[in-house]
Amino acid sequence: MNIWLSMLTTTGLGAIIGGFTNHLAIKMLFRPHRPMYIGKFQVPFTPGLIPKRRDELAVQLGKMVVEHLLTPEGIGKKLTNEEFQKGLIHWAQVEVDKVMTNEQSLRNMLEKWNVAHVEKEVTEKIEQVITEKIQAFLEEYYTYTWEQALPHSVHEKIESAIPNVSAFILGRATQFFESEEGKTRLSKMIDDFFASRGTLLNLVGMFLGNVSVVDRVQPEVIKFLGQDGTKQLLTDVLQKEWEKLKGRDVKEVETFVEKEMIVSSILSAVKVEETVSKFLNQSVQQVCEPVRETMIEKVVPSAVTKVLKWGAKNVESILNKLHLAEIVQQEVSTFSTERLEDLVLSITKNELKMITYLGALLGGMIGIVQGLLLLFLK
């Protein structure tokens, strides 16, 4: 009975010692968190292994992530995976479609994105661009003559239109002098003519009478305006003036209209601020609807594919620029010892517990062997 009690005792003690030893060894990986001193003498094995080697652990974790986990080959393979690409394209299409079918106005959406004063800034920018383009255009064209500035087709149209312009002018003049207003105006002109020619012509005017002179002059004026020779004369005059104009510099326009006035007139006609305001008041859906299908079906898949292709090609360079090893190292270095302990234990809790049990099992087995040895020795 004493023999079996001894074996049971040695087995129990061995199990307790083995389990406790392993448990203590595991605890000593993390604890104590700080070095302990007796006077000036530092107690051995303090701090624990992981607190003591935390900086080295951070460096090694950074290297492990870069060299074995997030490798260029692994990421490149993932980026070129067909299923991954399809999934990413589908996700991008859904997200872009959500934005393009949004019923909010552009103004409200931009305000949500903290884009302030967008209307004023866009208006000023557009006006600035228009102003610069107009000024550049005028600077260039002011160095030309009208013959150089106007296209050949415009020259042909103007020259072919001159006879029609002559006919139009003469036709309107004929209509005017045939009207009562024209006759009255002609009568006044005759009065003024005789009034400026002295006493003799006044006597002639009084002798003939004003009305009879108008009645005689009016048909002659109308007859003159209707003659082919008059039309040809006016056409020749207009043609000569056109030839003179072609040889003159466009810059002469500035004598009558300054650049600033031209720019101001064009900006007023364009109504940039009003146009921008109307555009911003439209919903995102209204603005995007004409291009929505093209964007979803063609642009998004093409853009995602090109980005992934570029990423796969340059993944090594991107990872080098990111300095992942340094990021991991810095993050781990900022962990408190308690957090680092919780992190490791959350991953290895079951395994460490099994190590404790294994220590107890081995200790118990050693206790049994010791008991058997004692039995044989007696």
From Swiss-Prot:
It is found in: Cell membrane. The chain crosses the membrane at residues 1-21, 357-377. It comes from the Bacteria. Keywords: Cell membrane, Membrane, Transmembrane, Transmembrane helix. The keyword Cell membrane applies. Disulfide bonds: none annotated. It is a multi-pass membrane protein. The keyword Disulfide bond does not apply. InterPro entries: DUF445 (IPR007383), UCP032178 (IPR016991). Its main location: membrane. Pfam families: DUF445 (PF04286). GO terms for cellular component: plasma membrane. PANTHER family: UPF0754 MEMBRANE PROTEIN YHEB. Belongs to the UPF0754 family. This is UPF0754 membrane protein BCE_0952. It comes from Bacillus cereus (strain ATCC 10987 / NRS 248). The lineage of its organism: Bacteria, Bacillati, Bacillota, Bacilli, Bacillales.
